Amino acid sequence: MTRLPILLLLISLVYATPFPQTSKKIGDDATLSCNRNNTNDYVVMSAWYKEPNSIILLAAKSDVLYFDNYTKDKISYDSPYDDLVTTITIKSLTARDAGTYVCAFFMTSTTNDTDKVDYEEYSTELIVNTDSESTIDIILSGSTHSPETSSKKPDYIDNSNCSSVFEIATPEPITDNVEDHTDTVTYTSDSINTVSASSGESTTDETPEPITDKEDHTVTDTVSYTTVSTSSGIVTTKSTTDDADLYDTYNDNDTVPPTTVGGSTTSISNYKTKDFVEIFGITALIILSAVAIFCITYYIYNKRSRKYKTENKV
């Protein structure tokens, strides 16, 4: 008996046709419905489940049984018994509600062949539209604002009192690659501090340098070079103040940037399609057996009643 529902399920999967799609936004309610083609047979039970292996509910007459932590507060069953259309309403959609929903009808013939159970299955895809980026993404990427930058040219430097000659090396462009995020740092001028050991005079030129980031945000980096002329030689030191530290959270390899999940769902249920079909078949068999027992009991009772009436007349 269990092979028949499995065979019917395989046949329905082979001849499956592309199913319709329903698109909703997060927080909305989605109503899914499907019609059965066989309008002559009697519906024993209807069911809804979500692919790949999450059963939602089973409905027999006026009784509705929910599975896999689904409740009527989340998904309401809005179909009268033995209707041509079965309908459910999913309330307050979230990204996890997206996926393929399947409705199934289990029907029996209205003739005397009560052992035959027909099975119909229809699919509907629910798409839940999510926002393109979250608030955290906007703050870290700086895509919603473009800070103003200012550039100050160095004043004239008078090194006439210096007793020695020194050279200042211009730093090469620095490229910081973190996964797909690239920051290109370009220096146009440096802040130079020159100290003469013989004269004791010093001149200072400070210029904030713009750092161009490919993600529409700009920060400044100030580099200072100090050159001291002594009798033993020339000593050059470097100090850096990097405003890009404000974006350490974004560039940190240990930090995972926030992501928005849309259109994908994962089910952790242990149910399989084969189990659903077996449950449907067993339940249908139990219901049919109960109907048969009722009919036999009614027939025997009716027969005795007629016999009793006949004896009384005589």
UniProtKB/Swiss-Prot annotation:
Glycosylated; contains phosphate and sulfate-substituted glycans. O-glycosylation is required for hemagglutination and hemadsorption activities of infected cell membranes. The keyword Protein biosynthesis does not apply. SUPFAM superfamilies: Immunoglobulin. It is a single-pass type I membrane protein. Residues 17-121 form the Ig-like V-type domain. InterPro entries: Ig-like_dom, Ig-like_dom_sf, Ig-like_fold, Ig_sub, Ig_V-set. Disulfide bonds join C34-C103. Glycans are attached at N37, N69, N112, N161, N253. Residues 17-278 are virion surface. PROSITE patterns: IG_LIKE (PS50835). The chain crosses the membrane at residues 279-302. Residues 193-214 are annotated as: Disordered. Prevents cell to cell fusion by interacting with and directing the viral OPG040 protein on the host plasma membrane. The OPG185-OPG040 complex associates with components of the entry fusion complex (EFC) presumably to avoid superinfection and syncytium formation. Via its interaction with C3/VCP protein, protects the infected cell and probably also the extracellular enveloped virus from complement attack. Heterodimerizes with OPG040. The heterodimer OPG185-OPG040 interacts with components of the entry fusion complex OPG143 and OPG094. Heterodimer with C3/VPC protein; disulfide-linked. This is Protein OPG185.
